[in-house]
C-alpha cells in the first residue's frame, strides 16, 4: 500500500516512549534478549517474551488483521470475521482481501469455538488475539492453550480507538517505527477533509444498526463519533441522556428501549452505522425512527460497518465518506 513504512527496527527505549501512553496494552521493554532473537513486552498478562522479528504471526480477530497489512507484516493465518462485513461464511474482508491473497494468508476456520488445531497447524511464532467481539472472547478463554503453541498477545478490549489498537499490534510485532508515518497520513487527510466540509449545525446522534430488533446508539467517545468530532461534527452525549441503559463492555454501544429512542436521539442530525442490521431506508419505515427530528428533516446519513469499528484503512475511508456527506457547497 503506498506510503506504508517498511522500516524494521526501533530501539526498545524509543519504543517505550512511543507507546507509553497507550492505556492497558503496555509498551515494549528491553528484556536483554533482542540479540538472541527475542524481546520482552508488557501485556495485561504480565511481561511476555516475543520474537524480535516474528515470521509466522497468526491473528485471531479479523478486526485486528488489517493493522498487520498496514504495518507491512502480513500474517500467515487469520480469522476473517469483522462485524457487519464477514461472518461464518468465510472470505477476506474487502479492505485487505487483495493483500491477504497476495501474501498467501490462510483463513482460520470460523465457528462457535476457536480451533486450536488450526492455529497450531499454522506453526506460529507469535499469536495475536483480543480486541472486540466474539473472537476476543474465544481467545481469552483459550489463552493457556494458545500460549503453549506460541507467545500470545491479547489486545485489551478496552482499546476502542483504532490508533491505540494499531499501537498495541505494532508493539507486539516490533513495528512501532511504522506507526508514525501511518498516523501522519491520517492527520494529513483529516486536515484536507476538515478544510473542505461544512459540518452539520447542532448535535449529531450516532445510531448503530445491528442484526436483530434491539435499539442501539453509539456513545460520543466511541471510535466513529470521535472521528466525526475531529471534523467538527458534535456528538450527542447519549450516555448522559440514558443513565440506566446498558453500556456494552467494549464501551462503543448503548442498548436502549425503543420507547427511549425519541428522547435519547432527539438531535437535528443523525448518522447510522450499518453493522449488519437494517439499512437507513429500512429504518425510515420504522415509526420509532421516522419520528426523530433528523429523519423528518432528512439530515440523516448512513456509513458502513467499517466505520463503526474502524481500523487504519477504515478510518481513512470514513474520512472520505465525511468529506462526501458534508462537502462545502461554496468550495
Where are the predicted features?
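Bacterial signal peptide processing site
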Residues: 25-29
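Extracytoplasmic substrate-binding proteins
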Residues: 47, 143-213, 316-331
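A short, structured surface patch at a secondary-structure boundary
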Residues: 65-115, 126, 131-132
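C-terminal motif of bacterial Sec signal peptides marking the signal peptidase cleavage site
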Residues: 19-24
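Basic- and aromatic-lined ligand-binding clefts that recognize polyanionic substrates
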Residues: 56-68, 178-243
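Proline-aspartate-enriched helix->loop->beta-strand connector
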Residues: 116, 123-129, 261, 266-267
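Structured C-terminal subdomain patch of bacterial secreted/periplasmic proteins
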Residues: 171, 264-331
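Bacterial N-terminal signal peptides that target proteins for export
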Residues: 1-14
Amino acid at each position: 500500500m503506498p506510503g506504508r513504512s517498511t522500516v524494521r527496527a526501533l530501539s526498545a527505549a524509543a519504543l517505550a516512549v512511543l507507546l507509553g501512553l497507550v492505556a492497558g496494552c503496555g509498551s515494549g521493554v528491553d528484556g536483554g534478549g533482542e540479540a538472541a532473537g527475542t524481546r520482552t513486552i508488557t501485556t495485561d498478562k504480565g511481561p511476555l517474551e516475543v520474537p524480535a522479528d516474528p515470521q509466522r504471526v497468526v491473528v485471531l480477530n479479523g478486526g485486528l488483521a488489517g493493522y498487520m497489512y498496514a504495518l507491512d507484516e502480513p500474517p500467515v493465518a487469520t480469522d476473517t470475521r469483522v462485524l457487519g462485513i464477514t461472518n461464518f461464511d468465510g472470505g477476506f474482508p474487502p479492505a485487505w482481501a487483495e493483500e491477504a491473497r497476495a501474501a498467501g494468508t490462510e483463513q482460520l476456520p470460523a465457528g462457535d469455538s476457536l480451533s486450536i488445531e488450526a492455529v497450531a497447524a499454522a506453526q506460529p511464532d507469535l499469536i495475536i488475539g483480543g480486541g472486540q467481539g466474539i473472537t476476543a472472547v474465544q481467545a481469552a478463554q483459550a489463552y493457556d492453550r494458545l500460549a503453549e503453541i506460541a507467545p500470545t498477545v491479547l489486545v485489551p478490549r478496552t482499546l476502542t480507538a483504532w490508533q491505540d489498537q494499531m499501537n498495541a499490534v505494532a508493539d507486539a510485532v516490533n513495528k512501532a517505527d511504522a506507526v508514525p508515518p501511518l498516523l501522519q497520513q491520517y492527520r494529513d487527510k483529516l486536515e484536507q477533509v476538515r478544510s473542505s466540509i461544512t459540518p452539520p449545525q447542532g448535535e449529531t446522534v450516532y445510531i448503530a444498526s445491528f442484526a436483530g430488533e434491539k435499539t442501539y446508539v453509539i456513545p460520543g467517545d466511541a471510535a466513529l463519533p470521535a472521528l466525526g468530532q475531529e471534523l467538527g461534527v458534535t456528538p450527542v452525549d447519549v450516555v448522559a441522556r440514558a443513565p440506566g441503559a446498558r453500556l456494552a463492555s467494549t464501551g462503543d454501544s448503548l442498548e436502549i428501549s425503543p420507547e427511549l429512542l425519541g428522547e435519547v436521539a432527539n438531535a437535528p442530525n443523525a448518522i447510522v452505522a450499518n453493522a449488519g442490521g437494517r439499512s437507513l431506508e429500512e429504518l425510515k419505515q420504522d415509526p420509532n425512527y421516522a419520528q426523530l427530528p433528523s429523519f423528518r428533516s432528512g439530515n440523516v446519513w448512513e456509513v458502513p460497518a467499517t466505520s463503526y469499528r474502524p481500523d487504519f484503512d477504515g478510518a481513512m475511508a470514513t474520512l472520505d465518506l465525511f468529506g462526501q456527506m458534508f462537502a462545502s457547497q461554496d468550495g
